[in-house]
């Protein structure tokens, strides 16, 4: 039964993924495949925003999130040494060894023709809840009192600092949960920090 999943001639070893005989016929094969998850298109997308003003100070924020969505990691994210690549940190910390028998991921294995013999089948091990909550924007500003500006012929001056993508709460490792590209080959959302002035004449 293992050969159908991993290829003819494969010898099961300690640390390989264990498969469930879903149909209960004593054989693990393609008939045991089943649907899992909600897909990688979120069923719920939401935002939370707010603002506060006190005297000359102002504050605003925007949270963005998604729910009821999942992502299946594949490619270089879950395949150690894929295409002569590196070893993702999650494999270093959480792959099976004789000293770490309760690890989340299967054992590390050598690469053959650019594809590792580590089990990379479509299994629940690599399926993650891709729900997330991200602080998309936060800004603090201060408007100078008009009496300070009379001599400069300026009617208004506001100083502000803001940040984008400051932090994200998510269970997905290695990749940006907002990005449905599941192999980690695209850049994540970048943090950005700005300081600025708004002038009125």
Question: Locations of the language-model features?
Answer:
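Outer-envelope beta-barrel architecture signal
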Residues: 44, 55-57, 131, 153-157, ...
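Membrane-embedded beta-strand positions of outer-membrane beta-barrel proteins
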Residues: 61, 159-161, 197
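Extracytoplasmic gating/loop element in the C-terminal half of outer-membrane beta-barrel translocons
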Residues: 8-13, 66-158
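Membrane-embedded beta-strand positions in outer-membrane beta-barrel channels/transporters
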Residues: 47-49, 137-141, 194-196
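Repeated loop/turn-to-beta-strand initiation elements of outer-membrane beta-barrel proteins
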Residues: 56-61, 147-148
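Conserved small-residue
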Residues: 1-38, 100
């Amino acid at each position: 039964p293992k050969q159908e999943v991993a290829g003819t001639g494969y010898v099961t070893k300690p640390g390989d993924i264990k498969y469930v005989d879903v149909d209960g016929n004593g054989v693990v094969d393609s008939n045991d495949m089943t649907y899992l998850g909600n897909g990688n298109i979120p069923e719920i997308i939401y935002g939370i925003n707010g603002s506060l003003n006190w005297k000359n100070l102002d504050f605003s924020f925007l949270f963005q999130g998604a729910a009821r969505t999942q992502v299946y990691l594949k490619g270089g994210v879950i395949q150690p040494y894929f295409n002569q690549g590196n070893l993702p940190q999650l494999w270093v910390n959480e792959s099976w060894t004789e000293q770490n028998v309760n690890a989340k991921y299967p054992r590390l294995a050598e690469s053959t023709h650019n594809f590792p013999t580590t089990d990379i089948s479509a299994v629940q091990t690599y399926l993650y809840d891709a729900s997330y909550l991200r602080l998309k924007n936060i800004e603090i500003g201060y408007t100078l009192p008009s009496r300070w500006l009379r001599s400069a012929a300026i009617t208004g001056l506001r100083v502000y600092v803001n940040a984008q993508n400051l932090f994200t709460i998510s269970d997905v490792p290695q990749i940006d949960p907002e990005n449905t590209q599941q192999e980690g080959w695209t850049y994540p959302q970048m943090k950005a920090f700005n300081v600025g002035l708004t002038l009125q004449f």
